[in-house]
């Protein structure tokens, strides 16, 4: 059986994975599980699957978690017994993908206008109750701030 490379440009695939994680975190989709990170394709045309359920689950208190899977030690304790915060976890995850921290910073800058527009877009959702809108807006704002704190 022939072997096909999954991605011709592994750095680009790693960057895409990091970007997908950031978008899930910033949109309040605390449900970024492996189904939403699966690979699809056949022959030599493999790639990431679409996001199957982009619902911002963190709008609902019962589902308000940052991510279902740990990354970069987020929430764990460091060598001094302090919790690993989001920015450090993102830096660690970025490094584990073989990317530079400057790539993370560039992605944060690229996504910032999209994320900053989310509160207005959330407020425009006619079927989402005000309580859930408020929670989701807080999540979006706090997550962006935490990701940028160095």
Which residues are covered by each model-predicted region?
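Anionic ligand-binding catalytic core segments
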Residues: 1-34, 38-150
């Amino acid at each position: 059986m022939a072997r096909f490379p999954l991605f011709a440009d592994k750095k680009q695939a790693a960057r895409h994975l990091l970007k997908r994680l950031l978008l899930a975190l910033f949109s309040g989709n605390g449900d970024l599980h492996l189904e939403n990170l699966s690979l699809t394709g056949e022959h030599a045309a493999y790639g990431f699957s679409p996001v199957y359920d982009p619902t911002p689950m963190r709008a609902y208190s019962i589902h308000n978690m940052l991510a279902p899977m740990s990354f970069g030690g987020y929430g764990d304790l460091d060598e001094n017994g302090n919790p690993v915060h989001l920015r450090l976890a993102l830096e660690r995850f970025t490094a584990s993908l073989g990317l530079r921290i400057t790539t993370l910073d560039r992605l944060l800058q690229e996504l910032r206008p999209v994320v900053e527009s989310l509160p207005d877009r959330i407020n425009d959702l006619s079927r989402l109750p005000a309580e859930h809108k408020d929670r989701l807006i807080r999540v979006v704002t706090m997550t962006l701030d935490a990701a940028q704190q160095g």
